[in-house]
A protein has these predicted regions:
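Non-transmembrane, aqueous-exposed alpha-helical and coiled segments at domain scale
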Residues: 1-171, 180-329
């Protein structure tokens, strides 16, 4: 499997005309998540690193979450040109002994190799090229995911944010709203005691924001850090813009402070994308980053209140509507 990563990196760097250690190279991959014929694929990451010089520690190699039964693929993006190369492994080739695999050509080792420019400014001016990439699934259905992450990384997206988008498996305005909500809560209800305090999220309603909060706060459902509930259309109308309830909980004192927050995606008059539909959210991903330090532009406080153990149980338990428990609906 290491040889697969090495071959992918070597081939891509030749095609993109990049040298080992080039600071403009980003690598995204499903390796480490994909399992092929019972074989885990994390060793491919070592091959990528050895050949390219990229690493997780340098913030230029990321694993994009995919279910284990999906193919293993590699994506190489050159920030300086916008050019990108997608390579999907040929599953049958991975069954070969190492020496036989080493003898394979690029076309034998990979079932799909596709090159395209995914820089958003290039796509704005060359929509026909974008139509080919997105409409014809140039990256086997991963176009939106890979283009979005690449463009924000290229414009200085923070490591933790990129990592969270990879957990969500793509970048979209919904994930960005999670970053803004997190920053807002952290400013209003800062963690003052790291041994006793943590954040809990009542994700009601749920959307992409909640995956970022799981990563940033370690607020996972399995550890009772997040409780996810949908709202009906009528309930959403009753509390317009409701994003959820966010609690700074002190597990020693068994009490906390809570914010019921609203999020308005249309609160700011952002620059608009005027091209084909595939570019709209990509463009929003980029322009929203200008507000990374101004999350309050999109957020409103619906209610601020105290929480004790009994109320926390009611907010979390099935059969109890958290917005009614909080008194906001």
């Amino acid at each position: 499997m290491q040889e697969l990563g090495s071959l992918a990196a070597k081939s891509a760097m030749q095609d993109l005309e990049l040298e080992k250690g080039d600071a403009d190279l980003l690598i995204l991959t499903s390796a480490g998540h994909a399992i092929v014929d019972g074989q885990t694929t994390q060793a491919a990451i070592k091959g990528l690193s050895v050949e390219s010089g990229n690493s997780i520690g340098d913030g230029n190699l990321f694993q994009v979450l995919r279910p284990h039964w999906k193919p293993v693929w590699f994506f190489f993006f050159d920030r300086s040109t916008g050019q990108a190369l997608y390579m999907q492994a040929e599953s049958q080739s991975l069954k070969k002994p190492v020496e036989e695999f080493k003898a394979l050509s690029q076309d034998e080792a990979f079932s799909k190799i596709s090159k395209a420019n995914v820089d958003i400014e290039y796509l704005r001016n060359h929509t026909d090229d974008g139509n080919i990439t997105f409409d014809q699934k140039g990256f086997n259905g991963n176009e939106f995911s890979l283009a979005g992450i690449s463009n924000v990384w290229a414009r200085g997206g923070a490591f933790d944010f990129i990592q969270a988008t990879c957990f969500h498996d793509h970048l979209c305005p919904g994930v960005t709203s999670g970053l803004f909500l997190a920053k807002y809560v952290e400013e209003k209800l800062p963690i003052n005691n790291i041994s006793a305090e943590s954040y809990k999220a009542i994700a009601c309603p749920n959307w992409c924001k909640d995956d970022l909060l799981q990563m940033r706060w370690d607020a996972t459902p399995g550890k009772s850090g997040m409780f996810v509930m949908a709202l009906t259309d009528a309930e959403k109308k009753a509390v317009p813009g409701i994003a959820g309830i966010y609690i700074r909980w002190n597990d020693t004192a068994k009490e906390g402070d809570a914010l019921a927050l609203g999020y308005n995606f249309s609160a700011v008059d952002l620059p608009q994308w005027t091209g084909p539909a595939w570019g709209s959210k990509l463009y929003q991903d980029i322009v929203l980053m200008d507000y990374a330090d101004k999350p309050e532009a999109f957020i409103s406080v619906i209610k601020e209140f105290k929480v004790d153990a009994a109320m926390l149980a009611q907010l979390q338990n099935a059969g109890m509507h958290p917005l009614k428990v909080a008194g906001v609906m």
